[in-house]
Every structure is written in structure tokens, then in C-alpha cells.
Amino acid sequence: MTVHKEVTITATSPESWEEAALSAVERTESSVEHIQWAVVQDQSIQLGSPEEPQFRTKVKIGFEVEE
């Protein structure tokens, strides 16, 4: 039997939503093995300063739990 776990990660990027989503997955890969899928749940822009907006994504990441 295979068991999966889901975590929700929020990441930001000054470049794009795509970069933010990839960053969320890459950072999760550094501490979690067997990632199976990722789904972008939400996107927004953080407007701390007009010159440097931050693209923010909320990503649900699923991975297989080892037995």
C-alpha cells in the first residue's frame, strides 16, 4: 500500500509566479524525498515597494511516505 502526504508551501520571487512555484518545489526537495506532484493553489503580488513587487504562490506538494 502506498501512502502520500501533502504540504502547502508559500514562496515568493521578484521575477515571476513560475519562479516562485519552482522555488517552492526546489526548497521542499531539499528536505523531502519522493515528491510526486505539485499544484499551484493561489497566486498574488506582494506590493512592499512599487519598484520591487514580489510574486507569491501557494503550492500544495504531495510526496510518498516511506514505510
Model-derived features with residue positions:
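Short, well-ordered alpha-helical segments
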Residues: T2-W37
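A cross-kingdom feature marking charged/low-complexity
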Residues: V39, S44-E67
